[in-house]
Curated annotation (Swiss-Prot):
Protein known as: Gene 5.7 protein
Domain of life: Viruses
Function text: Allows growth on lambda lysogens.
Organism field: Enterobacteria phage T3 (Bacteriophage T3)
Length: 69
């Protein structure tokens, strides 16, 4: 599995806070995932939740690319 899919899977399993070591160590992949709309920090009310969570688009992408869902 590519590093990108591993990051999506990890965030799906457990949302990661902005300043977590995991996000720091994978900053470029987290930025790419956010840019593609596969993860978001917004809550359902549109506020910053303080953590990255996978989006519906990210879940579909994981499923399509063979990542565990």
């Amino acid at each position: 599995m590519s590093d990108y899919l591993k990051v999506l899977q990890a965030i799906k399993g457990c949302p990661k806070t902005f300043q977590s070591n995991y996000v720091r160590n994978n900053a470029s992949l987290v930025a790419e995932a956010a840019s593609r709309g596969h993860i978001s920090c917004l809550t359902t009310s549109g506020r910053n939740g303080g953590a990255w969570e996978i989006t519906a688009s990210g879940t579909r992408f994981l499923k399509r690319m063979g990542g565990c869902v």
